[in-house]
């Protein structure tokens, strides 16, 4: 029996993208949008083999005729039927494996409702008949991937942002802070401010175009006010973007106004603190003796930390909040888009982790609540 056959599967189900692959690999084999699309129109071509639903890239490519829905919102699964479709697609179409032959490691956002992970556990054992499974906290995996056991992780994806202080491998639950402001909100905000420029994006398909504009053109300004002044006085910051129909649009100060909302949530009408302040607040909730180690190991992870300029800006903002003599280091690994998955791959292939799996037998004896006892 070759190694690949019993390799654990690592599935990082993000609100925006699903990352899946085999434990021990250094990158996910499959990365596709966490989308389920359903046709908006009646099929008229007989024998076209039209399906009643499409998942992932196929939904993305046929988006013009589909209504796209994301079953995961703010890191929490809101539609379990669609979620099952995504998992089915992951195992059978993307990885091409039989889930009943592999242990499965899933990930989840901290401070998620308990029912969410119970249901995940139930579906894995009852629908997919996995021999074993485990649910790991996303931010903890990112820290593993960076080769550290102590640090504060700022993990920001498409649906949720959280800051998790970890000391010697233990997450400190009292100091975890969660911010329901992430990539999807920035996409919506960019849709809104592009409308002010006279470009209208409204449908679920057009939102995907705006997400692409955001990923290709946005950046974080080191000094927002100064950048606004520069944008007003010259056209040096303007960039053009070609829409799928060939129309070219020009994007100016929207490029940095959009991600600025991460530092100033008031842009979105939210009263919460920005990511810099949230990170600082998380550190301040920790014991005074370990803060120094946390300041020196602030690790960024997730797709919403991919904006150029974000690490420098975080450094500047946290330096302003922290004691003046404090050494502050922001770590932004180049592979941080996938660091949760990479951490999962590392964890699931450790020999010491093998006794941590929840087995089918344990599940049959205890039911879904076993997940709270065996997974942090």
From Swiss-Prot:
PROSITE patterns: ACTINS_1, ACTINS_2, ACTINS_ACT_LIKE
Annotated InterPro entries: Actin, Actin/actin-like_CS, Actin_CS, ATPase_NBD
Localization of this protein: Cytoplasm, Cytoskeleton
EC number: 3.6.4.-
This protein's record includes keyword DNA repair: no
N-acetylaspartate: modified positions: 3
Enzyme class: hydrolase
Gene Ontology BP, a term: cortical actin cytoskeleton organization
Single GO term (MF): structural constituent of cytoskeleton
Function text: Actins are highly conserved proteins that are involved in various types of cell motility and are ubiquitously expressed in all eukaryotic cells.
Designated name of the protein: Actin-1
Species, as recorded: Caenorhabditis elegans
Lineage: Eukaryota, Metazoa, Ecdysozoa, Nematoda, Chromadorea
Gene name, Swiss-Prot/TrEMBL: act-1
